[in-house]
Curated annotation (Swiss-Prot):
Pfam families (UniProt xref): SLAIN
Keywords: Coiled coil
Amino acid composition bias (Low complexity), ranges on this chain: 405-415
Stated name of the protein: SLAIN motif-containing protein-like
Organism of this sequence: Xenopus tropicalis (Western clawed frog)
Taxon lineage: Eukaryota, Metazoa, Chordata, Craniata, Vertebrata
């Protein structure tokens, strides 16, 4: 029998007591209908308790561990089943003492063994409840209750065997659950070792980019292996750069082959041939104008033919090119080639111009030396005056020729000279006469003077006025040229060249020959009278459209001016016929050295112009 005060026992669960009492009430025949409701309530309570136990196991898993109680001689270990069984007190009898060491060893094994089996504590608890609650009908369970409502029970041999099996199962399940519950989510977190982090750089110990990892892996390779890998496996940028470089090299080779090909050689050959022909024909006085045109034409045509060839080749290259870089490079090469072609053309024109200028200078020096030998004396000032062009030309052509005479710069090249300037230079060079035929043309000029007298008496007043103004202006210009230079300055007459006959001499608007002769005369008239006679003529204007200078005639002329003209006319009217006769006789007897004396020529030219103006002022008066 079980005595309540002898030994501590395991208290029985209240739920089991209620279920036992309900079973006893059902056995009674005179129970009421309320018992059914009580039974239902008991079932609900059981379910709720099971759910509570499950929640407790999840929250506090260590509370369901089996606690060992010392005292092998008089008690078994108490098994705490988390409220399902408050206490189970098993009093061993004489035959049960042999099983006590086995139970104790199993309890020690439960505390020592640890296995990893997840979430089996609940199943073990359910099985243990089932074993404890569902007692077999063949087993005898004695229930003793004391006054303090403490229930103790005792089981026989068959009940003990079932209890031992349940305890063994519980020990295995609880031991596996302890190891599982020890492992938490924090165990999976890597431990950060600060000692190892201090060895790395301060800015990358927390985060390392994947590129740096790749670079670190590449550093491990040898340089030869790395070069082999880069050369075998090109990046897209490297391939694009290679393609552009290959395209540029191909275009450079094509331009080089084009520059050396026979496509451009005929134009260059023709240019050289025509330029050489032009340089050879520069010595003749009548071919300068045509030569300049030929130079200009051949230079421009050669450049155009070369440029057209370059343009066609550049279009082909632009079609063959595959990238934008090669196209832009093609344009750059085309511009560079054009610059080279222009440079070569300019160099060729420089050579031709230098050759022409040297030829003209040598020709002038030879003629000047011939005249100096004939005269015996020839000063430097006279040579400079002789080498310059006549002052009757325009100012721009004068400055151009003076710079061309003293400097070898190619101002007549097509790039820096307009066709009008070249034509004017050609015209003046063509009509410049040699010095050796002065006497013959003096005699011809006498005939032209007689023709002028006839025209003056036959033409109406308008024509006479134009003739008078033309002669007056020309005489004033000759006086200006004489006053600007010294008295010993050479004055050259303008006359047609040997290749041009007198019938082809150009005439002005009034059918008067444009070429005048300054005839030598007697030095009897003073220079002051000539200057006073030129003063009213200088005040006259001229018309640029017709190329002739005319007097602005008005009804009321200045009396002083007219008086001066009349006085001069009266003073020099007696010398007119004697001058013409003496000049005609001097054409065959006077030597050439006396003909070219500058002082007599200047005075005679001024005298000749003054005699032409003697009676001309009366023609405008009615």
């Amino acid at each position: 029998m079980v005595v309540p005060g002898n030994s501590p026992g395991i208290p029985r669960d209240h739920a089991i007591d209620i279920s036992d009492r309900a079973m006893d009430l059902e056995a009674e025949p005179d129970h009421s209908s309320d018992l059914k409701e009580v039974q239902k309530l008991h079932e609900l309570v059981k379910r709720l308790e099971i759910q509570n136990q499950q929640l407790k196991i999840k929250r506090n898993p260590q509370s369901s561990n089996i606690q060992n109680i010392s005292g092998i001689d008089n008690q078994l270990s108490a098994l705490n089943c988390s409220g399902v069984m408050n206490s189970i007190n098993i009093q061993p009898e004489k035959g049960d003492l042999q099983k006590m060491p086995n139970l104790q060893s199993q309890l020690e094994q439960i505390s020592s063994e640890k296995e990893n089996i997840p979430a089996l504590g609940m199943d073990a608890q359910m099985q243990y409840e089932k074993v404890c609650s569902d007692s077999k009908p063949g087993s005898k369970v004695e229930i003793n209750c004391d006054q303090d409502d403490c229930c103790f029970y005792s089981v026989d041999g068959s009940g003990r065997s079932d209890l031992e099996e349940a305890i063994s199962k519980m020990s295995e399940l609880n031991s596996s659950g302890e190891n599982i519950l020890d492992e938490t989510a924090l165990d999976e977190v890597d431990v950060l070792e600060l000692g190892s982090c201090s060895e790395d750089e301060e800015d990358c110990w927390l985060y390392v980019s994947p590129r740096k990892v790749e670079n670190a892996e590449q550093k491990l390779d040898s340089p030869l292996k790395w070069c082999r890998q880069v050369l075998d496996h090109h990046s897209p940028e490297t391939e694009a750069a290679c393609r552009s470089l290959i395209g540029k090299l191909d275009q450079a080779s094509r331009w080089k082959s084009l520059y050396c090909s026979p496509l451009a050689s005929p134009s260059a050959y023709n240019t050289n041939a025509e330029c050489s022909y032009g340089s050879n024909t520069l010595n003749s006085p009548g071919c300068l104008k045509s030569t300049n045109k030929a130079l200009l034409t051949c230079g421009s045509s050669g450049y155009l033919s070369f440029h057209s060839a370059l343009s066609s080749q550049s279009s082909v290259d632009s079609e063959l090119s595959t990238s934008d870089d090669s196209i832009s490079m093609g344009y750059k090469l085309q511009d560079l080639t054009d610059v080279q072609v222009m440079a070569r053309l300019q160099e060729e024109s420089l050579r031709q111009d230098y050759a022409s200028s040297s030829a003209s200078v040598s020709r002038r020096s030879s003629s000047a030396s011939l005249h100096s030998l004939r005269r015996g004396t020839f000063s430097d000032q006279e040579f400079d005056t002789y080498s310059l062009e006549d002052e009757d030309d325009c100012d721009c052509s004068l400055s151009f020729r003076s710079s061309h005479r003293y400097s070898p710069s190619p101002l007549s090249s097509p790039r820096c000279q307009s066709p009008s300037a070249a034509e004017s230079r050609a015209t003046t060079s063509r009509i410049r006469p040699p010095r050796r035929s002065i006497q013959n043309h003096v005699q011809e000029r006498m005939k032209y003077a007689n023709c002028e007298d006839e025209l003056r008496h036959s033409m109406p007043n308008l024509a006479k006025t134009s003739l008078r103004s033309l002669e007056a202006v020309r005489s004033s210009r000759s006086l200006e040229s004489d006053l600007q230079g010294p008295s010993s300055r050479l004055t050259r007459m303008q006359q047609p060249s040997t290749s041009t006959p007198p019938s082809k001499v150009r005439y002005g608007a009034s059918n008067q020959p444009a070429l005048t002769v300054r005839q030598p005369g007697k030095p009897g008239v003073s220079t002051s009278s000539l200057m006073t006679s030129r003063q009213p003529v200088k005040s006259s204007g001229y018309n640029n459209s017709s190329g002739l200078r005319k007097i602005q005639s008005s009804p009321g002329l200045n009396p002083s001016g007219s008086g001066a003209v009349s006085r001069t006319g009266n003073a020099s009217s007696s010398i007119k016929h004697s001058t013409v006769k003496s000049q005609a006789s001097m054409g065959s007897t006077v030597p050439k050295s006396k003909m070219i004396q500058p002082s007599r020529r200047s005075l005679s030219s001024a005298k000749m112009n003054s005699t032409l103006d003697d009676d001309s002022w009366k023609d405008g008066c009615y």
